[in-house]
Design a protein with these regions (language model features):
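Acidic, surface-exposed loops and disordered segments
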Residues: 1-173
Length: 173
């Protein structure tokens, strides 16, 4: 089977990570794959915030947990790093563009044997005063909206292989 198709079939959301950070070259390759995601009219309306700083990651996780309704929760599952995908809401297809970036990030991670998971609530995070403060710290205006948090790390989970697919999801006309 073609290697790209194999990765697409075998990629899983990972929720158990070892604590060590990713190798710089692996992280850079994942980021680059995200930057090459398709975008509407090639406007490239996204920004990737690579979070390697444990204190910043903890701030994001606390906000995410609060939005989820579990203030003491750990919705980042111990991942040592994350890439926050933001999109410029001045562009009409900002959400779609950011979603394509998220897919590329997760598929690139899988191709490198690195675990990843899309963690929701990024949009809500950057609507909160604390999230807006983070945007300001990063030099970004309030037009930047959260699309997703791609948590990353070397996995503690066994590789799972193919996943079953639901029937009746394709209609040829």
């Amino acid at each position: 089977m073609n290697e790209v198709l194999k990765v697409l079939k075998e990629r899983h959301s990972i929720r158990a990570f070892r604590p060590e950070p990713l190798k710089k070259e692996d992280l850079d390759a994942i980021v680059e794959a995200g930057l090459y995601a398709p975008s509407a009219k090639n406007l490239q309306s996204t920004k990737l915030v690579v979070v390697r700083d444990a204190a910043v990651l903890a701030r994001l996780e606390r906000l995410n947990s609060r939005i989820l309704g579990t203030p003491e929760g750990t919705p980042f599952y111990g991942a040592p790093e994350a890439i926050v995908v933001l999109s410029d809401s001045d562009y009409p297809n900002w959400l779609q563009d950011g979603s394509l970036v998220m897919g590329n990030l997760m598929n690139a991670a899988a191709a490198l044997g690195i675990g990843s998971c899309w963690i929701n609530r990024a949009m809500e995070t950057f609507e909160l005063p604390e999230g807006k403060a983070l945007l300001a710290e990063w030099g970004l205006g309030e037009n930047w909206k959260g699309v997703g948090n791609c948590i990353l790390g070397y996995t503690d989970q066994a590789v799972l292989g193919d996943k079953a697919r639901k029937e009746d999801r394709v209609l040829y006309v």
